[in-house]
């Protein structure tokens, strides 16, 4: 029975594959305030309050995505600027107060649907910002984008149920305890086989698609009617570009699909984990 399932690992992987926007950073000496970037200075109209913690400490720009520069991906905006800020003054671990983080106190996600590109209307004096010693990167990086297909991590909280719903053998009812145990072991064997083939292909910086994990999927513990199942941003540790989340970790931002459709970024799930 296992050999039959083992031969369908690739078929299963192809059935659940999703497109994402792959992000490739590059070193640059100069960026505009409104272009896509990791780190650096943000686009902010002068009449906008700079994002702060409740104690009044300025947050630092982690990433800025200008959707006029990205390929089109279903559910993501086709225009506007989306920003991710985190507390980087050393008071928290990359802006995380609790795991996972929903309160936008030590991080912030801000969306500008109609950017004003008149430089005279934009904040250009950031001398008030303290050094970003708690950022996972030290330099401002420009970003290139491309569409890429991504596989789901076996650590994804939805993965086990997807395996069961995909194969008819797991959908029988009125099973004995021994049969249920045997089928669960079969799922375990299938997951192990999948991980051997696909887990090393996961990771990287991206928008959309599936997240990668270095530990558990924190979303499994949330008690909400709707899951945080859309990956807004993933930023990986990246030696080439001096990005490091602790010990080879990864930072992820998730949103509920219904909130994304409304372009409501007030409730975003932020997670960070390292090896």
Task: List each language-model region with its residue ranges.
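Preference for intrinsically disordered or flexible, low-complexity segments
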Residues: 1-275
């Amino acid at each position: 029975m296992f050999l039959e399932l083992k031969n369908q690992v690739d078929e299963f992987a192809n059935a659940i594959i999703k497109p994402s926007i792959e992000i490739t950073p590059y070193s640059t000496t100069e960026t505009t305030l409104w272009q896509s970037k990791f780190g650096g200075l943000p686009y902010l109209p002068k009449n906008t309050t700079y994002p702060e913690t409740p104690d009044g400490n300025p947050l630092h720009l982690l990433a800025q995505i200008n959707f006029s520069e990205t390929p089109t991906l279903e559910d993501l905006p086709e225009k506007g600027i989306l920003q991710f800020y985190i507390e980087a003054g050393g008071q928290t671990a990359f802006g995380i107060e609790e795991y996972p983080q929903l309160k936008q106190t030590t991080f912030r996600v801000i969306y500008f649907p109609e950017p004003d590109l008149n430089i005279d209307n934009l904040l250009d004096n950031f001398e008030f910002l303290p050094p970003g010693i708690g950022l996972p990167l030290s330099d401002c990086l420009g970003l290139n984008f491309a569409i890429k297909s991504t596989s789901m991590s076996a650590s994804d909280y939805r993965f086990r149920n997807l395996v069961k719903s995909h194969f008819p053998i797991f959908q029988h009812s009125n099973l004995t305890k021994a049969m249920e145990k045997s089928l669960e072991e079969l799922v375990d064997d299938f997951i192990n086989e999948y991980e051997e083939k696909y887990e090393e292909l996961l990771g990287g910086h991206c928008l959309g698609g599936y997240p990668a994990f270095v530990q558990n999927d924190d979303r499994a513990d949330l008690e909400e009617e709707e899951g945080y199942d859309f990956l807004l941003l993933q930023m990986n540790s990246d030696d080439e570009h001096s990005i490091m989340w602790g010990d080879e970790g990864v930072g992820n931002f998730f949103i509920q699909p219904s909130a994304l459709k409304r372009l409501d970024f007030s409730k975003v799930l932020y997670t960070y984990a390292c090896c």
